[in-house]
UniProtKB/Swiss-Prot annotation:
<comment type="function">
    <text>Transcription factor. Interacts specifically with the W box (5'-(T)TGAC[CT]-3'), a frequently occurring elicitor-responsive cis-acting element.</text>
</comment>
<dbReference type="InterPro" id="IPR003657">
    <property type="entry name" value="WRKY_dom"/>
</dbReference>
<dbReference type="InterPro" id="IPR044810">
    <property type="entry name" value="WRKY_plant"/>
</dbReference>
<feature type="DNA-binding region" description="WRKY">
    <location>
        <begin position="256"/>
        <end position="322"/>
    </location>
</feature>
<dbReference type="Pfam" id="PF10533">
    <property type="entry name" value="Plant_zn_clust"/>
</dbReference>
<protein>
    <recommendedName>
        <fullName>Probable WRKY transcription factor 39</fullName>
    </recommendedName>
</protein>
<dbReference type="GO" id="GO:0043565">
    <property type="term" value="F:sequence-specific DNA binding"/>
</dbReference>
<dbReference type="GO" id="GO:0003700">
    <property type="term" value="F:DNA-binding transcription factor activity"/>
</dbReference>
<keyword id="KW-0238">DNA-binding</keyword>
<keyword id="KW-0804">Transcription</keyword>
<dbReference type="GO" id="GO:0005516">
    <property type="term" value="F:calmodulin binding"/>
</dbReference>
<dbReference type="GO" id="GO:0005634">
    <property type="term" value="C:nucleus"/>
</dbReference>
<dbReference type="InterPro" id="IPR036576">
    <property type="entry name" value="WRKY_dom_sf"/>
</dbReference>
<keyword id="KW-0805">Transcription regulation</keyword>
<keyword id="KW-0539">Nucleus</keyword>
<dbReference type="InterPro" id="IPR018872">
    <property type="entry name" value="Zn-cluster-dom"/>
</dbReference>
<dbReference type="Pfam" id="PF03106">
    <property type="entry name" value="WRKY"/>
</dbReference>
Amino acid sequence: MEEVEAANRSAIESCHGVLNLLSQRTSDPKSLTVETGEVVSKFKRVASLLTRGLGHGKFRSTNKFRSSFPQHIFLESPICCGNDLSGDYTQVLAPEPLQMVPASAVYNEMEPKHQLGHPSLMLSHKMCVDKSFLELKPPPFRAPYQLIHNHQQIAYSRSNSGVNLKFDGSGSSCYTPSVSNGSRSFVSSLSMDASVTDYDRNSFHLTGLSRGSDQQHTRKMCSGSLKCGSRSKCHCSKKRKLRVKRSIKVPAISNKIADIPPDEYSWRKYGQKPIKGSPHPRGYYKCSSVRGCPARKHVERCIDETSMLIVTYEGEHNHSRILSSQSAHT
C-alpha cells in the first residue's frame, strides 16, 4: 500500500503542475503536452499497482469526454484572458425574464458578479420580486390581451341539447358557461385569480342532457309504406304495440284439440306450437267475424287439470259482438 500511495501522490503533484501551466497566460504547448503525458503514465502506474493482486485484471481506457468549453474557465483562479475565448465556443447567456409578469414585480438591471473573461459569460441574479408573484397567480388581462372590441361576444348555442356558451370580453376577464335545459340552469364564474364563484351552489354540475329525449319528438315513426326513402325493405325502428292479454280457464268440451268452447265471436285457427313439458300443443286463433280485426287468442290444455283449457285473449276487437253458432273453423 505504501508504494501505491507514493505513486498516487506523485501523479497528483504532476497533475497540479499541469493545472498551473493551464492557468498561466503564456504557456508553451510543447511543455504542456510533455507534462500531460507524464501525468497519464503515472496514473497508469497507479492503476497497475491497484490491479496487481486481482488476478487477470485489465485496465480499459474509455474515450475521454471532450467539452465544448475551454478548460481554463473551470479553474478556481479568476485570472483569465478575454482574448482566449473564440467565437466558436457556445455562449451561455443569462435567461431573459418572462414576458407575462405582474405589474408590481420590479426587475432591476442585471449586475455581473463574476465575469469570466467574456461579456456573455456572467452569473448574476439580482432581482426584486413582489410577494404576490410567488403566489403563482396569473396576471390580470392587460390591453394587449383584450379583444379588439370591448363588447365582442362569441356565443355558441344549440337548441336540441340546451348548451349555451358565452364568451364576453367587456372589461372583465371572466368566463361564464351556462348550461340550461328547461327550468334547470346554473351559472358558474371562473375568475383568473383561481377563485370559483357559483351562483347556484353547484359548481361544475354536469347534468346529463340526453339527445335521445329531444330527438324522440322530431323522429317520425315509419308506417311501413316505404315512404322513408328506402327502395327495399324498410329498416326504420317501429314501436311494438303493447297488447293487453287476459287469460281465463274454461272446461274442455272434448278430448279433441280442435274443439274449443264457443264465445260471442267467430275464430279461425292459423297455427299451433308444441309446449315444452306438455303432450298437448297450443293453438292460435284470430277473429274471423270482421275482416282485419286485430283480436287474437291462443288455447292450451292445463297441465295440472287436463279437463280444463286456458284461453288467453290478446288485442281488442274493432267491431261489435256477433253471435255465431260455429265458434271455430279448422
